Swiss-Prot record:
Family membership noted in the UniProt record: Belongs to the cytochrome b family. PetB subfamily.
A molecular function GO annotation: oxidoreductase activity
Gene: petB
Name the record gives this protein: Cytochrome b6
Cellular component terms (Gene Ontology): chloroplast thylakoid membrane
Ligand binding (heme c): 35
Cell location: Plastid, Chloroplast thylakoid membrane
PANTHER family cross-referenced by the UniProt entry: CYTOCHROME B (PTHR19271:SF16)
Protein role: Component of the cytochrome b6-f complex, which mediates electron transfer between photosystem II (PSII) and photosystem I (PSI), cyclic electron flow around PSI, and state transitions.
Cofactor section: heme b; heme c
Positions annotated to bind heme b 2: 86, 187
Family annotation (NCBIfam families): PRK03735.1 (NF002990)
Additional comment: Heme 1 (or BH or b566) is high-potential and absorbs at about 566 nm, and heme 2 (or BL or b562) is low-potential and absorbs at about 562 nm.
Amino acid sequence: MGKVYDWFEERLEIQAIADDITSKYVPPHVNIFYCLGGITLTCFLVQVASGFAMTFYYRPTVTEAFASVQYIMTEVNFGWLIRSVHRWSASMMVLMMILHVFRVYLTGGFKKPRELTWVTGVILAVLTVSFGVTGYSLPWDQIGYWAVKIVTGVPEAIPLVGSSLVELLRGSVSVGQSTLTRFYSLHTFVLPLLTAVLMLMHFLMIRKQGISGPL
């Protein structure tokens, strides 16, 4: 086992990486409220795992979506638990994100030289809310359908381009299969990918610049 470790150590300098990770200075003013960002990340990872599990059974069509969700809840082993965890962690992620934003703002964590960290954080906040909007429609029940109809109809009030934006969001003039397909793609592929990339950038900048000092 030691020879295997030495082989990797010689090529990757594992010990140096571990030392760099574990020896980072933590300011004495840091308290439990500085963990809110990490809790948000944990909720995101739970979302990815539970959401991936549900993709094995969910069917993104207007005729089968609701029935497939019911199947997950009543027939799949622990399906009710997986979906419930997904919903609970979604609510927790939004709450932790909001508290994290307030904590950073109130402690001045957005000030120079951490402006870009703040910008990526704000974008991540928008993506988090977008997860909620797109995921809400996927069961394709009455609540989800009318929520999508209202949300996608909001841009229509924008002069000149409003109607085009509505059609872009819905995939057609009215809410239907194209809308569900778009929201499913956004919820399961586009948004998770963007969130993962921005989270990586966010944490690398925090790692580089360190935690902001007390006010």
